[in-house]
Amino acid sequence: MFYHLIAPLKNKTPPLTYFSKERHLKGALVNIPLRNKTLLGVVLEEVSKPSFECLELEKTPYFLLPFQIELAIFIAQYYSANLSSVLSLFAPFKECDLVGLEKIEPTLNALSQTQTNALKELQKHPASLLFGDTGSGKTEIYMHAIAQTLEQKKSALLLVPEIALTPQMQQRLKKVFKENLGLWHSKLSQNQKKQFLEKLYSQEIKLVVGTRSALFLPLKELGLIIVDEEHDFSYKSQQSPMYNARDLCLYLSHKFPIQVILGSATPSLSSYQRFKDKALVRLKGRYTPTQKNIIFEKTERFITPKLLEALKQVIDKNEQAIIFVPTRANFKTLLCPNCYKSVQCPFCSVNMSLHLKTNKLMCHYCHFSSPIPKICNACQSEVLVGKRIGTMQVLKELESLLEGAKIAILDKDHTSTPKKLHNILNDFNAQKTNILIGTQMISKGHDYAKVSLAVVLGIDNIIKSNSYRALEEGVSLLYQIAGRSARQISGQVFIQSTETDLLENFLEDYEDFLQYELQERCELYPPFSRLCLLEFKHKNEEKAQQLSLEASQTLSLCLEKGVTLSNFKAPIEKIASSYRYLILLRSKNPLSLIKSVHAFLKTAPNIPCSVNMDPVDIF
């Protein structure tokens, strides 16, 4: 008999010991009896015979690959997450007959000398940062790196931050890698996922393009991971376990012979700081040089005469425009001009957004909706006005000003299914649409030859927010959106902001901004300090506060040297009827943070809290 430690899946029970007639089962998925049920579990390791009687496990044909087991254990430890819950993220492998596909010889565009030099430099390092201006040809470098990996009979993974990036990226890669390419994201149906995995098992799929969950796929002989748009916050999960896929890739490059390339035109400050002195490859300028004119307007009006004239010229020349708006819906909030009270969600301490299409107010946190009120609840005034314009309101105003213009919206409300997303992007690519209005989705890597005008509205709402990353997020967005214009033809960028003096300093070279921000960023925040955020919530505000106070007292006894603690009410104090209090831990040493949190969780297991290591924001 052989004894094995098993982590039950989708169950918070700690690992348990079972016996088997087989050994060397590490990573195997097995059926185990537990409390009159049969559960699926993962074998973690072989152990000595225990002093108590054990039940027998039943082996299945599925198993996790060694890198998956290693990664799962790291996630559980680093992010203070339940190991069984973490293991449930991973898709297992199954041995099967290999598909005898005809060998694909990729037909690639020749790289320029600059691109060739960049690729050679990237391949000198297990992990590196490709800092390439928009339009500089990063994707061509990616494809050559992937082709070389497949030639070595290894598999490759290309991570993209959002599903909105994948259709266009897929088309470019499909022409080159044909049947070796597979697409993975959360909107796939269960049947589509099953078909995908069967092709992965047979190694028909050797290159996966996917969002962050693709990192948990069983890619055999994984040799290369590319993280495109590495700066994007979408790589950070906001649900437990709150992992950052980009950072996990860097961990894999450290533990396994897997090359990792991070790519961005606007790299995150943390990545720039990490790589700037050792493995940063700078790719300046455009692959196809074009002229771009940047125009600032100091105004709080949205559709100004100057902007309207520019849009008319775009339509007259049969070209295209994109317009960035940070808010979906018609307006971010409904305000009473008499008493200055806004309409708030009854379950969250946030304003409700105005959606005229459905004639409702909606909370974008808990999704509560209600009819649009006719009077102010606070002072009974019959006048309510919308504030902070959204995508739908921009569409409404432009349709009245640009008769006959074909305008579409790219935001969460309009891309609820993959088909809707594809239709919007394909119509714009086929020039069936003149103007595309969108939220941050519009900034993410789209490449359209006929876009000659990029418009940035409402950027002040981002750069003036309370986040310590506010300026970084705002300037990065400016660069990304400006990069959608004049990729193959000359064009213009309209930026409406009252902070033109500040922003004008950084529009020549994003590296100028990174160096400025490194000097300005307080020592209390990343990349100079590491953060861990603990959240305590309860339907009763006093109990939520009491939980955080009890936790603070316990934590103060558990803190490692160099770790500081602050306790405060969350900036958004209520979400979905639960009041929220936060504890923020800081340290220059991440290991000290992890040890402090582990000690607290062990000392106070009955104090419920969520742990967010390396939070991208504090809200």
From Swiss-Prot:
Keywords (A to Z) from UniProt: ATP-binding, DNA replication, DNA-binding, Helicase, Hydrolase, Isomerase, Metal-binding, Nucleotide-binding, Primosome, Zinc
GO cellular component: primosome complex
Broad EC category: isomerase
Motif (DEAH box): 228-231
Helicase C-terminal domain sequence ranges: 371-532
HAMAP family, sorted: PriA
Identification of the protein by name: Replication restart protein PriA
Organism of provenance: Helicobacter pylori (strain J99 / ATCC 700824)
